[in-house]
Amino acid sequence: MNKFFYSIDNNNNNISFKNHTLIWPSLTLGNIGQLTIDVLICSFEFKRIGFIVDENITPIIGNDCFTTLDNNNGIMSTSIEVYQSSLFPSITLVQQRSPIVDGRIPNFSENLFKWINAEEIKEILFLSSSNANKRVDSQLTGSQVRFIKSDNVDKNIISKLNEMNISEMELTVQSPEGETIQLSNRLTGLAKEIYSTINSKNNDNNNKVSFLCLNLFCSEGYNTNEALQMSNLIYNFIKNQESPSSPQLKTPSCWKLLQGPTFDQSLFF
């Protein structure tokens, strides 16, 4: 396959993804996944190690999303960036800032899956969101996060999710007449394509990759609180024995412009 990942220093030999969990944001309602990745990068010393470059991704370039007044390095942001941290040696974060070209999701998914296998990545974890208005009765109370998994997910992961009070996405519901109604698993776009690919290859002995998606029910709006909630959940999911019990979450400087400038409060006094 064509080169897919480019390291910062053009030397891929110093970077390993073997047995990593790759955390990827879905471009879904409220941008919960992308905002969550922002928080994780800022809070846990994740450093940019490279970029994913593919003809199926809309190219963009912009200002550094994580610049502070005392650390203005003038680093540019690009379409898809890859991050790792010494605090979580088996975790790789991906930040996707631009969409896949219309109609090219299957092509990008194929290239991504080949790269994941070539790098011996253990698991891909999507962070997703879906419309709270479309919940069924059993989803109205309790945790608003559900998981969707491939058939080959490790049982220990399922046990950990259950301990965190995260249930599997409901796929059926009973109608008042007693009929069973099939429900969507809420996957869309790239997550849906990768999920289908991994499940179709379960009988392939060469496929060692598992799929997991954490989906948060939400409404469109100012979704930073939901992103912080999801960040806390992800921390508890990936933390190790040396990690503090409670995370100190930080938000990036670029969040100051999420909703534009604030109003002049003196207008009302």
From Swiss-Prot:
It is found in: Nucleus. InterPro entries: Proteasome_assmbl_chaperone_2 (IPR019151), Proteasome_assmbl_chp_2_euk (IPR016562), PSMG2_sf (IPR038389). Coiled coil: none annotated. GO terms for biological process: proteasome assembly. GO terms for cellular component: cytosol; nucleus. Keywords: Chaperone, Nucleus. Pfam families: PAC2. The keyword Lyase does not apply. Gene3D superfamilies: PAC-like subunit. Forms a heterodimer with psmg1. Chaperone protein which promotes assembly of the 20S proteasome as part of a heterodimer with psmg1. Belongs to the PSMG2 family. This is Proteasome assembly chaperone 2. It comes from Dictyostelium discoideum. The gene is psmG2.
